[in-house]
Amino acid sequence: MSTVLKMEHIEKVYGNQVRALHDISLEVSAGEFVAVIGPSGSGKSTLLRTVNQLVVPSGGHVYIDGEEVTGASGKKLRLLRRKVGMIFQHYNLVQRLSVMQNVLHGRLGYMSALDGMLGNYTEEDKRKAIDLLQEIEMGDRLYNRASDLSGGQKQRVGIAKAIMQEPKLLLCDEPIASLDPNASKIIMDLIYQMTQRRNIACIINLHQLDVAMRYATRIIGLAKGEMIFDGTPQQLNNAVIEKIYNTSMENLIIKQGENYA
């Protein structure tokens, strides 16, 4: 499988000398479904944001599809960001626009600024958007405003928007943190199925350890900005869990279940 993402010795230190990431190195191949776990403040969100330079690392190198992202700016950075879709916890939709318009926004990186402002999407783009909305079972809501949707529906639209970008890598930052268990399962199923069908690499930050173990082909564990674990769900034993979270796997899953109650 081809390498989509390569990170070498990534460091991130904020101005107040807080170390968010230390010596993170990893590679992710096409089609991998990688869950990043760890307690709050472990560096999960910072790690994802260094990939597309929403957070600029203090040291190290990031490569997307063989091209270095670190230090890139202007047109080069925009071109590289086309290859990376992102799904956020809080949906990142334009609430006053329709579902269809929000999904079409996934094509803005391929358009001129003027065409983007005027909404001059191609007929092919419109057909792709409709097909994606059918795939996420939102085809009957094309012209509903995003503000009229439930949280789970908004996240489905966010997924379609990210896939509309035709990325090689999808970054998902706590996409089910605000959802109930039923909506969470729908969202996780969609992210997994849609990336697997298209051979898109996916890195997803999760607080829910049981969810990570159910879906991921690979799990990365962070604690205090350092990589503690990188392996398969089957290799994630109680000793590793205690090192990452400072508690047992059983206690962690019970506590997470109580948060859903």
Annotate the PLM regions.
Residues 145-149, 153:
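Conserved ABC ATPase signature
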Residues 181-183:
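Helix N-cap at the start of a conserved alpha-helix in ABC-type nucleotide-binding domains
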Residues 166:
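Conserved catalytic motifs of ABC-family nucleotide-binding domains
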Residues 37-39:
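The feature captures the beta-strand-to-loop junction immediately N-terminal to the Walker
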Residues 52:
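Helix-to-loop junction immediately C-terminal to a conserved catalytic motif
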Residues 170-173:
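Catalytic Walker B motif of ABC-type/P-loop ATPase nucleotide-binding domains
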